[in-house]
Amino acid sequence: MEMELIQGNEAAVRGAINAGCNFFAGYPITPSSEIAHGMAELLPKFGGVFIQMEDEIASISAVIGASMAGAVAMTATSGPGFSLMQEGMGYAAITESPVVIFNVMRAGPSTGIPTAPSQGDAMQARYGSHGDYPIVVLAPASVKDMYYLTVEAFKIAFRFSTPVIVLSDEIVGHMRESVALPPLGEIESYEKRAKNLIDGRRRHRTGLVHTENGLPTTDLEEYEKLLRLLFAKFDDFRPMVRFEGEEGVLFVAYGSSYRLAKSSAKLLAEKGVSAGILKLESLFPFPEDAVRRYSKKADLVVVPEMNAGQVVKEVERVCCCRVKGVSYFGSLILPEKLVEIVEGEL
């Protein structure tokens, strides 16, 4: 593989096509539009279908329908569109439809600042639709991650028959890095067939609580059985985390904030303060065991986030040591500022 300068959103397009994606429905929205543009240009060249829908509600509906018909389907959006997709995501979860939803986060709420980054949709990604349901959320922190986590998103979607959200942000989506990636068209080999796909026989698919045959029911025992089955699927899910550095101060970070944490850990090391980073490549199901294990050896756990403090609540829930959340909005803070905050806690 040769080195090339490529944008994060462009890497996501290549990852999707190389993962076998053959259907994309979406509505352009900053800062995710490059994904739609790339899929519109490239997907038909590989026998796929691109449809620009009238809005994000139609987009998620089309993607779920295509998935039920056997397509490898994906959509992409940002905050306002992500909000419109929430009912559809719940429908995808209860019907066990393998779809991939890209959210390149921007500053909110409402229209917010379309060109400013944010990590404010982290909890919406996990809990945005009503009711109880499991979902997988991946969080790329680099252009390389944008490629490989997109590929992984499709593999997870089909392995667990579930919607998967790739939660990026404006920084990662629009940055350019020199990386070595597989060439466009080098299709990944994996099982691209949902376990409950229609196969020559009549099958019911409904958003109502249903039996194993897909028939609607109001029986509370069947309701509990359905929910427990949906969650039990993920007993075999292995959270994707990476630790680097040394024991001491532990940064727990995801997405573009991981880049801030990495630079800050380096500055602390230069000052003689041991520090390490636990990079969360999968946010949900939350990697409780990994966070608990690494935090036991930490003097202080620091969770930097480009929001008012969302994932830090999950970290606090499983940690027994001191946890410091650091919030910032619309942009990353300088590593020197984060180091100053950390030193004030030591």
Swiss-Prot record:
Q: Return the protein name.
A: 2-oxoglutarate synthase subunit KorA
Record EC number: 1.2.7.3
The record's keywords, sorted A to Z, are: Oxidoreductase
**Which of the seven top EC classes does this enzyme belong to?**
oxidoreductase
Matching entries from Gene3D superfamilies are given as: 3.40.50.920, 3.40.50.970
**TM regions (residue ranges):** none
Domain of life, per the record?
Archaea
- Which GO MF term does the entry hold, naming one? 2-oxoglutarate synthase activity
Q: Which organism is it from?
A: Archaeoglobus fulgidus (strain ATCC 49558 / DSM 4304 / JCM 9628 / NBRC 100126 / VC-16)
Q: Which Pfam families match?
A: PFOR_II, POR_N
Which catalysed reactions does the entry list for this protein?
2 oxidized [2Fe-2S]-[ferredoxin] + 2-oxoglutarate + CoA = succinyl-CoA + 2 reduced [2Fe-2S]-[ferredoxin] + CO2 + H(+)
Question: Which PANTHER family would you find in this protein's record?
Answer: SUBUNIT OF PYRUVATE:FLAVODOXIN OXIDOREDUCTASE, SUBUNIT OF PYRUVATE:FLAVODOXIN OXIDOREDUCTASE-RELATED
